[in-house]
């Protein structure tokens, strides 16, 4: 088939009863004085650029009466739903649940419209996010209401009485980093209007929480609940601590009274997490998977099983009771089923066969002989790490399974599974951009490894074709492209490789050997960064290293910059605090962030994860500590940013959530670190800061990546306001400014990109003036004429996971202080004064005539005219319309040209105009243009240059370029 090539203009760049009433999320309270109105930023738009690869999920549920309907809760990406057994997924709580971390989902069996969601994941790895209580929907996820338990923080399970949707139980784990009383099993009998704590550890209520629950489907007065005492010190990288107090409990009166179960179960001080399930076909059969390493086991500091060859007695394994929990037998002690229990320990039972059960670990294991033997039914060589399985109580062949790679569904009894390559819920730690055109974004995805995504696709949409795993970097390291060759990638601690060839690029040298008395330390993520001043490459552990030959050789340029004897936080319990006396010694800190000065190659700022800031002014020969006095040990310097305009200025984002402090902290210095100010007005509690970046082109314009959303400051941090707009609430981990684009890495929704954010720069210069104007046209950003090859072959089915290309055309932003009395018009004028493109707000939108087309209506979506409502808006001006087909639908040719209505041109020109609207003749050529906005008879203009495609040196000289009959 002939493949047309059109020229498009694209802008890239838990017996004391406690009654609790619902409370509101605290993070809603903050000082917003001095902010610009949200309408002044409303036209700025975020674009999801993938990758189309699922991220870590924990909570899953289904609707027994609608067998193709399932729900999943991403640990950072919110609540999602499928109505076609996993063929496609869509988010259902982005506007109803203001937190991305989901720990539990339960659908009421007697009324599937009632859904309860518990926020805050219970798999409390070192990188996790908190919750803000329980939410409820009564319309199958369309709308949501917060119903309390905000301070429970992490919720492991919710169960609903099978006969009464208003009787619900919640297993609350509590705060991870401090003691708090909101732990245990909570019950509501009025649908969440009020809560009563019905199970907790009376002798230690502030440290022992609840993590799992099971209900007898035939007698809902019978419940089983597991208690778990756990905590994390701020230096912990892997397993959390286990404290005394855990165990399995049973109630036979709907939660009024409870009894601890023993009769063969471990009851020592080393009992960890326990998963429990009741066989629906025989409720006397109860299953449990128990984490218990035993008193004789020496626990390594990083967690995991005991050292090889060490004699020990453990209580871990799979247990079965055939008398409703009175007595238990350990039927299987294989460590593959229960090891690393803090991260797993979940079990599910077939609804018909009580001997058929599933245990969840690095693989999903099935037994059909009552637990004697298990075989994996889902798992890959890398160890996918699975978490929860929901089995349809009316059809045991249908199930939904969560994992570190996303959520999958089986409709044939675990023989085959749906894909997780249709869930844009990746957890990305950092973001970097290369200098190719179009450019790529890079980062490390938790549990899946390094990933690169293209920000533009010649197919018109971003799909599986436009991202790829990187040739290096594990799940947590930085991925940094070479500034001169985007194919060469560097992975923090992993070396260097050629992405195009998928081959390692020899380094020729290694990091200098560590001092045997001070061995190299590391944490989950370590920084690696190129200096913008001289392209030196920096890397760190407790030392800072530099390479001037792109990693072929390295020199250590600092002493150990972490604290010598960091204090133990007062928020820790005594047992967890002892963790600091491990054989590794009390040295845990590392240099967590590096900020080379973009304007002085000899100046480098660094911050540690245990709360210190240093700076060198002489290439690393000498280092000076310049830590703000208010900072204490274990205040993690999550990012330090050297100013692009002043060598004495730097910004440091400080994360203290590991000290149970969720307040935001951004320190600013203008005198080389002598004095610091905490500049966070406008950022609420809960939004602790993961990164702060300065705009490289506009002094005083700052961006902050927080645990809840992105914030922007137009006045050097004195005042902040949300830059959320259409982006869902999620943990934002990193930011990079690339040309005129703003890219972020999120911990639950992958990479997001704001195309052409130049309006932010203009607001930083004269925002108050713009706000006061009746209308204002912003200066467009850099724009390029690029070839957009149409589909080569049939388009991807719309069910395939896809996201949109950047808008095609000159991206015009405009502000209307109030709605004008007349229609507005925007034009693109060439150097001769001719209008090459024009759109008007009164252009009627012609609905798709489904009786006259030969494709589904999803393939023919009308283009909307520019808005004339109050606020900031954007519109893409282009002669040739985009021809992309995305999940949100494509766009058809634009409406009748507002500059030249039908019938106003000579016949030949009329035909040409019509053909052009169908993607006909040549699009906009490179050159100088003017954007003109007309509002109530007044015109506003701004210049724009359309640059040639950097990949096409002959562009501009070829007059026929972009013709409708061009073939490839």
Predicted regions and their residues:
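Boundary at the C-terminal end of the N-terminal hydrophobic targeting segment
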Residues: 22-26
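Beta-strand-rich binding/interaction modules
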Residues: 812-813, 820-839, 928-932
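Glycine-centered tight-turn motifs at strand-turn-strand junctions
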Residues: 835-922
């Amino acid at each position: 088939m002939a493949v047309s090539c059109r020229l498009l203009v694209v802008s890239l760049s838990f017996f004391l009863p406690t009654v609790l009433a619902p409370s509101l999320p605290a993070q809603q309270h903050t000082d917003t004085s001095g902010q610009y109105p949200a309408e002044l930023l409303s036209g700025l738009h975020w674009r999801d650029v993938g990758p189309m690869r699922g991220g870590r999920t924990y909570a899953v549920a289904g609707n027994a009466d609608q067998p193709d309907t399932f729900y999943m809760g991403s640990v950072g990406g919110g609540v999602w739903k499928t109505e076609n057994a996993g063929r496609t997924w869509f988010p259902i709580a982005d506007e109803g649940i203001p937190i991305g971390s989901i720990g539990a989902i339960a659908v009421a069996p007697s009324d599937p419209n009632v859904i309860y969601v518990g926020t805050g994941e219970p798999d409390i790895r070192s990188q996790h996010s908190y919750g803000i209580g329980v939410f409820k929907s009564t319309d199958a996820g369309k709308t949501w209401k917060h119903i309390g338990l905000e301070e429970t923080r992490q919720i492991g399970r919710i169960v609903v009485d099978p006969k009464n949707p208003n009787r619900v139980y919640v297993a609350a784990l509590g705060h991870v980093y401090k003691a708090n009383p909101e732990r245990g099993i909570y019950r509501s009998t009025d649908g969440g209007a009020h809560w009563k704590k019905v199970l907790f550890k009376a002798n230690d209520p502030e440290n022992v929480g609840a993590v799992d629950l099971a209900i007898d489907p035939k007698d809902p007065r019978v419940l089983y609940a597991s208690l778990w005492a756990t905590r994390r010190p701020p230096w912990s990288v892997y397993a959390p601590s286990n404290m005394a107090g855990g165990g399995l409990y049973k109630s036979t009166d709907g939660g009024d009274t409870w009894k601890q179960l023993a009769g063969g179960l471990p009851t020592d001080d080393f009992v960890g997490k326990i998963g429990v399930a009741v066989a629906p076909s025989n409720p006397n059969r109860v299953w449990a998977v128990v984490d218990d390493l035993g008193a004789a086991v020496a626990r390594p500091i990083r967690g995991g099983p005991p050292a090889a060859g060490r004699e020990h007695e453990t209580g871990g394994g799979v247990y079965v009771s055939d008398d409703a929990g009175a007595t238990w037998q350990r039927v299987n002690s294989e460590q593959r089923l229960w090891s690393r229990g803090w991260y797993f320990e979940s079990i599910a039972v077939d609804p018909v066969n009580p001997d058929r059960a599933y245990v969840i670990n690095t693989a999903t294991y099935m037994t059909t002989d009552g637990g004697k033997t298990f075989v994996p039914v889902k798992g890959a060589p890398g160890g996918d790490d699975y978490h929860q399985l929901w089995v349809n109580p009316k059809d045991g062949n249908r199930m939904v399974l969560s994992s570190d790679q996303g959520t999958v569904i089986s409709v044939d009894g675990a023989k085959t599974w749906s894909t997780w390559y249709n869930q844009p819920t990746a957890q990305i730690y950092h973001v970097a951009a290369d200098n190719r055109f179009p450019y790529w974004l890079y980062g490390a995805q938790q549990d899946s490894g390094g990933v690169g995504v293209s920000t533009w696709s010649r197919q018109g949409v971003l799909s599986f074709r436009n991202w790829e795993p990187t040739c290096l970097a594990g799940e947590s390291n930085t991925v940094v492209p070479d500034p001169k060759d985007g194919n060469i990638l560097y992975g923090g601690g992993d070396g260097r490789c050629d992405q195009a060839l998928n081959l390692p690029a020899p380094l020729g040298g290694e990091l200098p050997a560590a001092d045997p008395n001070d061995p190299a330390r590391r944490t989950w993520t370590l920084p690696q960064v190129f200096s913008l001043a001289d392209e030196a490459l920096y890397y760190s552990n407790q030392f800072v290293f530099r390479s001037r030959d792109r990693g072929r050789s390295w020199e250590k340029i600092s002493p150990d910059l972490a604290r010598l004897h960091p204090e133990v936080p007062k928020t820790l319990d005594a047992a967890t605090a002892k963790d600091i006396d491990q054989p590794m010694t009390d040295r845990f800190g590392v240099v967590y962030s590096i900020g080379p000065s973009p304007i002085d190659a000899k100046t480098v700022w660094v911050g540690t994860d245990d709360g210190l800031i240093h700076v060198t002014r002489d290439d690393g020969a000498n280092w000076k500590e310049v830590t703000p006095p208010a900072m204490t040990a274990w205040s993690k310097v999550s990012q330090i940013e050297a100013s692009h305009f002043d060598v004495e200025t730097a910004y440091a984002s400080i994360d203290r959530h590991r000290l149970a402090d969720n307040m935001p902290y951004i320190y600013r210095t203008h005198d080389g670190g002598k004095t610091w100010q905490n500049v966070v007005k406008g950022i609420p509690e809960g939004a602790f800061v993961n990164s702060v970046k300065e705009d490289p082109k506009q002094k005083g314009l700052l961006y902050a990546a927080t645990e809840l959303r992105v914030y922007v400051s137009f006045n050097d941090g004195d005042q902040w306001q949300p830059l959320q707009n259409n982006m869902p609430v999620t943990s934002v981990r990193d930011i990079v400014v690339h040309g005129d684009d703003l890219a972020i890495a999120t911990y639950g929704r992958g990479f997001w990109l704001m195309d052409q954010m130049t309006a932010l720069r203009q607001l930083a210069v004269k925002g108050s003036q713009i706000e006061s104007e009746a209308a204002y046209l912003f200066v467009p950003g850099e724009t390029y004429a690029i070839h957009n090859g149409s589909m080569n072959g049939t388009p991807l089915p719309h069910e395939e996971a896809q996201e949109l290309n950047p808008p095609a055309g000159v991206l015009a932003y405009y502000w209307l202080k109030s709605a004008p009395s007349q229609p507005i018009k925007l034009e693109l004028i060439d150097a001769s004064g001719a209008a090459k493109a024009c759109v008007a707000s009164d252009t009627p939108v012609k609905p798709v005539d489904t009786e006259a087309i030969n494709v589904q209506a999803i393939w023919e979506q009308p283009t909307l005219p520019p808005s004339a409502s109050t606020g900031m808006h954007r519109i893409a001006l282009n002669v040739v319309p985009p021809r992309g087909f995305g999940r949100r639908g494509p766009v058809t040719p634009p409406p009748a040209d507002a500059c030249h209505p039908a019938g106003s041109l000579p016949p030949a020109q009329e035909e040409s105009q019509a053909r052009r609207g169908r993607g006909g003749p040549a699009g906009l050529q490179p050159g100088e243009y003017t954007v003109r906005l007309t509002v109530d008879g007044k015109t506003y203009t701004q210049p724009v240059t359309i640059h040639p495609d950097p990949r096409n040196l002959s562009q501009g000289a070829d007059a026929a370029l972009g013709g409708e009959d061009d073939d490839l």
